[in-house]
Amino acid sequence: MHYKNIKLYSYTFFLCLLIFGCGQDKSIEKNYQNHYDIESGGRLINAMTGEPSNLIAMIAGDSASSAIANNIFNSLLKYDESLNYSPDIAESWSISNNQKTITFKIREGLFWADGEKLTSKDVMFTWKLVTDPNTRTPYASDYQLVKKATTPDPYTFTVTYEESYAPALDTWTSLHILPEHLLKNEDVNSTYFSRKPVGSNYYKLKNWKSGQQVSLTRNTLSINGKANIDNLISRIIPDTSSQFLELTADNIDLMSINPIQFQ
């Protein structure tokens, strides 16, 4: 009888602990408005399911190519965090009263990663390249609507459309400007440049190991200033389950997930 009482008291004691413990448990509130100091240096490793076909976005039809090329090249304009137009290579732009002409003012003092100056000549060259019938690109149609393009000086690029075109500015956010001095005598469809690009953005190509990874390193001549991360590495891991195992093992820092994995 004494033994049964001890068991009963024990069960009652632990039940009380459980009840009061749960009652005092308070959910931790997270403040997502907190701001933290930005750290500089190090590397970021992400996983990609496919290998880039090349690093010239206008002739690439895959997302892997564009994702990496976006870190190497700039466009005339870009979107800010509120999806408003923001300066990139162009510091300003104006639209004529008849809505047919756009004048872009190019920022002065810009350089390619190899030290050559970036000017309106490069913008004109890129427009001619994307509209060239010999360039195998699916993106030409938007730029073929331009009936006239001029470069009055090294820092001005003007385009005139046959008719007013509402998405005109949008199209100039996605066209990567390419260096004329490296591509003017090249066939863009087969050039070495597609695997050894020279751009103007935060990063430049360090090495490309086919089937394994593409490594970028900080471009000290970036037109947008110093990147916070020294190196970006994109590892090619076709299977998402393998990517997840690499993520849990801390061998990669980022991966894309599907809705099932999110749940």
Regions flagged by a language model, labelled:
Residues 40-50, 91, 101-104, 123-126, ...:
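Short, well-ordered beta-strand elements
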Residues 47-97, 128, 198-199:
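N-terminal lobe/hinge region of extracytoplasmic solute-binding protein
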Residues 22-26:
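Bacterial signal peptide processing site
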Residues 220-263:
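Ligand-site clamp/hinge motif
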Residues 80, 173-227, 231, 241:
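Gly/Pro-rich hinge or "lid" segments in bacterial periplasmic/extracellular proteins
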Residues 91-136, 158, 243-248:
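Aromatic- and charge-enriched surface segment that lines or borders ligand/interaction sites
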Residues 10-19:
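Bacterial N-terminal signal peptides
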Residues 141-183:
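Surface-exposed binding/hinge segments that line
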